[in-house]
Amino acid sequence: MNEKERNDYFYVCALIEYIARETRNHRGDIVSAIGEAGIEKLLYDAEVNHCLSFEQVSDEVIEYYKIHQGDFDTISGCNYSIPSFLDIGKLYSIMIEDCAKKGEEVKELMKI
């Protein structure tokens, strides 16, 4: 994985975490709603979209993929400091790079 791909996966993973928090859904539900083709499109657009705010891009993704509000809350009951959506995105992008076979990164993102 080259540096651009690392940055793209970091961005998309952080975006998924951001959307999950905003809509109170599990990350897996967000990934399922977007689908493999949608993830590939987000990766393709990541270099441009990272110049926009997460709020704007997430609003567009939520509307386009018709992601509904859920009731999953991972934040309010925590006793410790909560990692930011960027921290979680970085963690997931590292896991994808470490675990995925070459050419199967999108499938790995969907599994994680």
Task: Name each model-derived stretch.
Residues M1:
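Active-site helix-to-loop segments that bind/position phosphate- or nucleotide-bearing substrates
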Residues Y11-Y18, K90-I94:
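A general alpha-helix detector
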Residues A14-I62:
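N-terminal interaction modules that seed assembly of large macromolecular complexes
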Residues S32, A46, D73-S76, V106-M110:
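Short coil/turn segments at secondary-structure boundaries
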Residues G77-I112:
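A charged, amphipathic interaction segment
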Residues V48-S84, I88:
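Long, compositionally biased
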Residues E40, E60-D71, I94-K101:
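Amphipathic alpha-helical interaction surfaces
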